Amino acid sequence: MISLFDMFKVGIGPSSSHTVGPMKAGKQFVDDLVEKGLLDNVTRVAVDVYGSLSLTGKGHHTDIAIIMGLAGNEPATVDIDSIPGFIRDVETRGRLLLAQGRHEVDFPKDDGMRFHNGNLPLHENGMQIHAWHDDTVIYSKTYYSIGGGFIVDEEHFGQEATNEVTVPYPFKSAKEMLEYCNSTGLSLSGMVMQNELALHSKKEIEEYFGHVWQTIQACIDRGMNTEGVLPGPLRVPRRASALRRMLVSSDKLSSDPMNVIDWVNMFALAVNEENAAGGRVVTAPTNGACGIVPAVLAYYDHFIESVSPDIYTRYFLAAGAIGALYKMNASISGAEVGCQGEVGVACSMAAAGLAELLGASPEQVCVAAEIGMEHNLGLTCDPVAGQVQVPCIERNAIASVKAINAARMAMRRTSAPRVSLDKVIETMYETGKDMNAKYRETSRGGLAIKVQCD
């Protein structure tokens, strides 16, 4: 059973699969060296990056993330402001301090990080890390970053965890999830809470979701108060701060019945601009789609009622349960199934979370989730210049509004839906697997080859 602590992870931008996952892989590799007593024998480290990680790795800061992981950092706690200086030092000296400064090794600028266009056999996002003693490899590991900041090594790819804790309601489909809700009389969030209580204490759950909400609020606040241009060759101007000023200062806008949409857009833009700048964000379920779940909860907070611990906990539980279904039965990796697995899943999650807060039945929550995905089927992932900016940032805003609409449509429906959530999840996965690789986070097709950098 996937814990919702894993669905909502605090990390850094711009990508969960290409930044958060690779940093975790680097950290895991150096932890292995320490555990096996090999660290002091290492004289050089080399990294090979494959597939989508390679093709869009520079724009997604994959190389930087791996280096910071090897240095002993974790995405949730790394000092973001220290990263540029640390990377400059590594590039200048060709030396890398491993494991929080415990041991220094060679890391040549031209040979320490090698990018390969081909894929490794098990997934589109693959990397190999090698530790050398002089001319001999003394430890090597292959990792796959499978979306949402999740990583798995080659030996455990496709395997279920052997030490899983038994939960009271071990659902693997929406059908099973609804059966548990109907047999117990629990709401969706209430049922999922019982599963989480088998994995974590009540205090741990309260503290974790409190930290997630605080991180989201801080991210929105930074994003809507920061001006300038986002990093990279596109030089995309930040828009959230200007939109906020317009909304706050204009009397004409305040009387516009569509005003709420502008606020939702602003919340989403704020989060995704922070992500694009390498800021602190929450995977929901990925970084590329990290603005949607926050924007919809911020909408509820500003236009329906102030968000309390009970409200954000119920929201995250319902949204996270839907995200877990996609993770278990399909994919949340843009490199595997296109943007429908990122923005599509986030839209589905946010629609479900909002419906839960609005008093929807478990069946209506699943209808909202289904609508949120159905109208994102086939969505491609074609980041311009390999960066999580165009079309990603604006796409989060559009999907946030779509999620709110999906929740409202689900709750006002009087007829039985013809498409189930399980069927739309199955369809999304099959559609993604049929999708040409040009449209799965390789920057080899779509907008990525039509939009030129200055």
Language model feature labels by segment:
Residues 8-26, 277-296, 337-347:
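Conserved phosphate/anionic-ligand binding catalytic regions in large, soluble enzymes, centered on
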Residues 44-57, 89-97, 315-328, 370-383, ...:
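Short, mixed-charge aromatic SLiMs
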Residues 75-253:
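C-terminal regulatory domains involved in ligand/effector binding and gene-expression control
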